[in-house]
């Protein structure tokens, strides 16, 4: 454990951010998986609605630096292609 006061504070804030980032990433992954599941079911309307939420989560994660912006774009493109193929 850190001894210096500022290092102790940084450790606390880093842990808080780590937990928050982890939750944000998990929510993003869940949204993407939900779209995939709906595509497999063949439910195009529900998949399109879930796609809107997944897009929002991906963009937010990219803007916060949790994922690279190109990964967000790639994932959105792949999801859109799967939905369009229905």
Swiss-Prot record:
GO molecular function: small ribosomal subunit rRNA binding; structural constituent of ribosome
Xref: InterPro entries: Ribosomal_bS20 (IPR002583), Ribosomal_bS20_sf (IPR036510)
Coiled coil: none
Keyword rRNA-binding: yes
One cellular-component annotation, GO: cytosol
An individual GO BP term: translation
Entries under Pfam families matching the protein: Ribosomal_S20p (PF01649)
Keyword Ribosomal protein (UniProt): yes
Keywords, alphabetical: Ribonucleoprotein, Ribosomal protein, RNA-binding, rRNA-binding
Region (Disordered): 1-25
Task performed by this protein: Binds directly to 16S ribosomal RNA.
Family: Belongs to the bacterial ribosomal protein bS20 family.
Protein name: Small ribosomal subunit protein bS20
Origin species: Exiguobacterium sp. (strain ATCC BAA-1283 / AT1b)
Gene: rpsT
